[in-house]
């Protein structure tokens, strides 16, 4: 056996006999936000009509404000719960974004989604997901 092989074996044995850290476990998995967004988009395409028209500048402005990211998420989650149910994949995936968005107290009202208008919901949520992706990337929270 070569000395390099013996060294590797000794390192392995040392690692196995090393004392275990006490306290919280080290989290090695990361939430795959890109996959969550893809699942939301795939579900939206299956269950909602293609959006007609486009967002006006005021709507885009409401979606991009960092102080409204959490409030806007709540609007999308409420619509998703009311429309698809609290156990829907869209709702569950949206909920995953709550811990990573800023919780600033908004000074303005969040985005408005027309009542029971799936096209409006889809159009605004698609834009919102792009904004969230950019926000997470800017904070180095984005995980593929």
From Swiss-Prot:
Keywords linked to the UniProt accession: Cytokine, Growth factor, Secreted, Signal
Annotated Pfam families: IL3
Signal peptide: 1-17
GO molecular function: cytokine activity; growth factor activity; interleukin-3 receptor binding
Compartments where located: Secreted
Chief location of this protein within or outside the cell: secreted
Oligomeric form and interacting partners: Monomer.
Protein name, entry field: Interleukin-3
Gene name of the record: IL3
């Amino acid at each position: 056996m070569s000395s390099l092989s013996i060294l590797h074996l000794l390192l392995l044995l040392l690692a196995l006999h090393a004392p275990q850290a006490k306290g919280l476990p080290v989290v090695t998995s990361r939430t795959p936000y890109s996959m969550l967004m893809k699942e939301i988009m795939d579900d939206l395409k299956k269950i909602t009509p293609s959006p007609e028209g486009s967002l006006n500048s005021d709507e885009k402005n409401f979606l991009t404000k960092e102080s409204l990211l959490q409030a806007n998420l709540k609007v999308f989650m409420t619509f998703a719960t009311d429309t698809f149910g609290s156990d829907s994949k869209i709702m569950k995936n949206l909920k995953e974004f709550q811990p990573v968005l800023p919780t600033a107290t908004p000074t303005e009202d969040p985005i408005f989604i027309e009542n029971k208008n799936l096209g409006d919901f889809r159009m605004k949520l698609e834009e919102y997901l792009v904004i969230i992706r950019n926000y997470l990337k800017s904070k180095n929270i984005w995980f593929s």
